[in-house]
């Protein structure tokens, strides 16, 4: 996506351009082979899209270049636009020396194309190719990214540049906007430190569970009393939107009276991001690509890792503005983009917004109007400080996930509705993701809500969050914190269908 603005006309031109690629049969597990064979297309069929995974330079500012593994030599990867319910073919070439996974985040796809080794998805072999055939759904803003482990290698996994947006066109478009702008937020040049996490208090409700807090703080105090330092955390040197630092990319040019639909993706490996546009508000119409029951105007957007927000901004305050992160240091190091009204001269202006707390429930139905679950599953998150060679180890119900023994922890039956009661005994905010399904938000730190469908939810420090999902997509299903540093060190679990 070289241009932030994607018009419908540009989409039609893009959709008409396809690249032929030779079909290469990958190595499969037996189950994945059967699933893929059912969707196989003739060798001569041209793909709808072709993606190439390879190292490439990214010019984040004039004469300032970083190197990263990317899709098609660019960051972010190309915008892929699909039609809901219409089968697509994507050829993925891996030009690196490392087997790769490409995860279709937020889509209801089968295991063999989901892109997670933990579920058994075949790897895209080094210097090889896989042809992926699937039916895109549900409609809305999704994305694709690597699902490889990073660990201590801060050039691998989601620390790399392997992130790209997906927009699945609904069968019916409600309209209400003049054009779309896609923004991908991403940091580069990560490094390790032992400073500990910086407290963030933007989530509402702010209610903490005393039992969870006592357990988490007690464990941390005990660890520090033994002389153990804080576990490693990741920080970054450069911050970008669409691969360019603030002031060094093309501005988003607008006209007075335009209604611009911004599709915002937090493509970070580890960071929670905020976004504000002075003198304007965002009318949030979708979270993680799913329409919200109650669209609401807000002054600030908050996005956990891998979250997406679609919001309409009415351009009615002419000027040249900075749309940027609330954190002054992050914004000064690049996390922003210029919004420029036609005919308006001058330097971009930033005005810090008033304090604002992010509450998912403001976009939902009031009260608990959702169906009762068939079963409730209790899930406890816990941190073992610096337990793995200086890195924090994370557990779900006292078990740290292991790829050597990836046994399913939870068992579900098709067609049943399950409530996940997630309890966070750490002070970290965890963006929790469930593969191949969406879930409904039910309760947020004691506050009931309904109707909000997501595939990532931020679970606040020492808080409890409840979500419901329907087991309607058989196969192994990965559940994890989307912070690379957490999922690499135990914060994952598998569901299976029985």
PLM region spans:
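A structural feature that tracks compact, well-ordered secondary-structure segments
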Residues: 263-267, 273-278, 311-314, 322-328, ...
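Terminal connector regions
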Residues: 152-153, 319-340, 482, 487-490
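Active/binding-pocket-proximal capping segment
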Residues: 278-291, 397-399, 425-452, 484-488, ...
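Histidine-centered copper-binding motifs that mark active-site loops
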Residues: 2-5, 15-18, 22-305, 311, ...
């Amino acid at each position: 996506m070289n241009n932030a603005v994607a018009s419908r006309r540009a989409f039609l031109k893009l959709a008409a351009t396809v690249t032929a690629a030779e079909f290469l049969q990958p190595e499969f597990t037996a189950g994945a082979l059967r699933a893929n064979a059912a969707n196989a297309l003739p060798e001569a069929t041209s793909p709808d899209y072709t993606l190439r995974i390879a190292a490439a330079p990214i010019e984040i500012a004039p004469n300032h270049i970083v190197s990263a593994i990317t899709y098609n030599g660019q960051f972010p990867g190309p915008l892929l636009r699909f039609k809901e319910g219409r089968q697509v073919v994507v050829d993925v070439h891996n030009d690196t020396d490392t087997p790769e996974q490409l995860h279709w985040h937020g889509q209801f796809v089968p295991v063999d194309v989901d892109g997670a080794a933990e579920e058994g998805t075949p790897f895209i072999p080094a210097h090889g190719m896989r042809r992926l055939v699937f039916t895109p759904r549900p409609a809305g803003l999704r994305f694709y990214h690597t699902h490889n482990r990073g660990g201590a290698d801060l050039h691998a996994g989601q620390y790399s540049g392997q992130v790209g947006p997906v927009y699945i066109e609904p069968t019916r478009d409600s309209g209400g906007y003049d054009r779309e702008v896609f923004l991908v937020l991403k940091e580069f040049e990560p490094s390790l430190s032992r400073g500990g996490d910086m407290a963030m208090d933007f989530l509402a409700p702010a209610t903490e569970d005393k039992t969870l807090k006592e357990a988490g703080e007690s464990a941390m105090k005990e660890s520090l009393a033994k002389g153990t330092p804080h576990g490693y955390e990741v920080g970054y040197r450069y911050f970008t939107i669409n691969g360019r630092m603030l002031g060094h990319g093309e501005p988003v040019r607008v006209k007075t009276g335009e209604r611009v639909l911004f599709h915002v993706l937090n493509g970070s490996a580890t960071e929670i991001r905020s976004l504000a546009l002075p003198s304007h508000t965002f009318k949030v119409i979708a979270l993680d690509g799913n329409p919200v029951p109650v669209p609401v105007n807000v002054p600030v957007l908050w996005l956990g890792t891998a979250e997406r927000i679609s919001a309409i901004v009415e351009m009615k305050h002419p000027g040249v503005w900075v749309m940027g992160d609330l954190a002054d240091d992050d914004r000064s190091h690049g996390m922003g983009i210029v919004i420029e009204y036609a005919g308006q001269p001058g330097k971009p202006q930033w005005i810090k917004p008033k304090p604002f707390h992010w509450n998912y429930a403001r976009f939902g139905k009031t009260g608990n109007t959702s169906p009762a679950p068939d079963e409730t599953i209790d899930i406890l998150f816990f941190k073992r400080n610096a337990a793995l060679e200086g890195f924090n180890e994370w557990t779900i119900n006292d078990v740290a996930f292991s790829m050597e023994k990836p046994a399913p922890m939870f068992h579900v039956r098709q067609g049943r509705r399950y409530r996940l009661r997630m309890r966070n005994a750490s002070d970290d905010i965890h963006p929790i993701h469930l593969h191949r399904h969406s879930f409904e938000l039910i309760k947020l730190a004691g506050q009931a809500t309904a109707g909000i469908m997501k595939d990532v939810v931020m679970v606040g420090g020492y808080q409890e969050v409840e979500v419901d999902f329907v087991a309607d997509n058989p196969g192994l299903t990965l559940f994890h914190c989307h912070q690379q540093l957490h999922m690499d060190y135990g914060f994952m679990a598998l569901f299976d269908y029985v």
